[in-house]
């Protein structure tokens, strides 16, 4: 990888209780990409983000922004980063306009009403500019948080569970905004519980569990490497269990005995499907329909976390 915009080296966070929230994490973020950091609750996602954003102090390790040590020039490095936290923390009595403008000033940026206007319009907040924060819905407050994070024109934007509390329509609008930001050159690192969104939007994916990065790759490469393909057979008559004669096949039975699943290696020279169908015919097991299903990113995520817990 050439010239990552953000480099994390040996990042570790340990508390006096003995808990290790991060265990020597190494991560490079490419300029202009959307990177999805996935993990269960308590995995270390928010801790990592908070360290990079200067909210939490690391026990060990370093953060480089454009190759420069984060601590060596904190003000400059922090001005390059925007953060949309999970919590909706705003002054309830301030207007949308004041909230976003004040955030810009905190980073030493001069007043620029034209830029604030453009930002609010991009996020469909212009009509709400005079509204007080306490008058907004949860979804609109989330948009204001994004506007705050972008007010000082950062190169890197962290989105920590940005879809939390947002309805489906607003969520779609929000992700469209994210796509446009990425098209404009903003580097985006997001965490989300909506893994199907990460599958749709991310260029690369990292999975963190118990403070360790257990997988990181191009999204498509990860899905090709770890994804599995399943043949789903809709049976004409339900079965109580998989017959002993089919014990050598990787079969599972669901749907109250109506649905037979065969998991096969899509990279193998032979999938075995033709042989399986012949054996079903020999056993006089009739079927009504066939279909195949490729593992989703969520399937892969669940398997990775399960394997990690089993190994632990």
Where are these regions (language model features)?
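Conserved ABC ATPase signature
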Residues: 132-136
């Amino acid at each position: 990888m050439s010239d990552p915009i953000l480099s994390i080296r040996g990042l570790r966070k340990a508390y006096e209780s003995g808990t290790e929230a991060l265990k020597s994490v190494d991560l490079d973020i490419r300029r202009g990409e959307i990177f999805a950091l996935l993990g269960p609750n308590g995995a270390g996602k928010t801790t990592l983000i908070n360290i990079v954003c200067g909210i939490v102090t690391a026990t060990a390790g370093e953060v480089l922004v454009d190759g420069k040590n984060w601590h060596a020039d904190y003000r400059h490095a922090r001005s390059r980063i925007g953060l949309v936290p999970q919590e909706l923390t705003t002054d309830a009595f301030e207007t949308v306009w004041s909230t976003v403008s004040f955030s810009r000033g905190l980073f030493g940026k001069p007043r620029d009403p034209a830029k604030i206007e453009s930002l609010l319009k991009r996020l469909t907040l212009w009509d709400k500019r005079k509204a007080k924060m306490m008058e907004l819905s949860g979804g609109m407050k989330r948009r204001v948080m994004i506007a705050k994070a972008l007010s000082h024109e950062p190169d890197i934007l962290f989105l920590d569970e940005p879809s939390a509390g947002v309805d489906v329509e607003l969520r779609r609008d929000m992700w469209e905004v994210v796509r446009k930001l990425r098209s404009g050159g903003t580097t985006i690192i997001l965490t989300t519980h909506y893994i199907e969104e990460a599958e749709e939007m991310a260029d690369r994916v990292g999975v963190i569990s118990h403070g360790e990065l257990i997988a990181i790759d191009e999204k498509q490469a990860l899905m090709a490497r770890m994804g599995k393909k399943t043949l789903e057979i809709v049976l004409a008559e339900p079965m109580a269990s998989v017959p002993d004669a089919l014990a050598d096949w990787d079969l599972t039975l669901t749907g109250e005995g109506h649905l037979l699943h065969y998991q096969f290696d899509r990279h193998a020279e032979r999938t075995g499907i033709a042989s399986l169908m012949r054996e079903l015919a020999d056993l006089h097991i009739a079927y009504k329909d066939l279909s195949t299903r490729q593992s989703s990113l969520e399937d892969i995520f669940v398997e990775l976390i399960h394997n990690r817990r089993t190994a632990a």
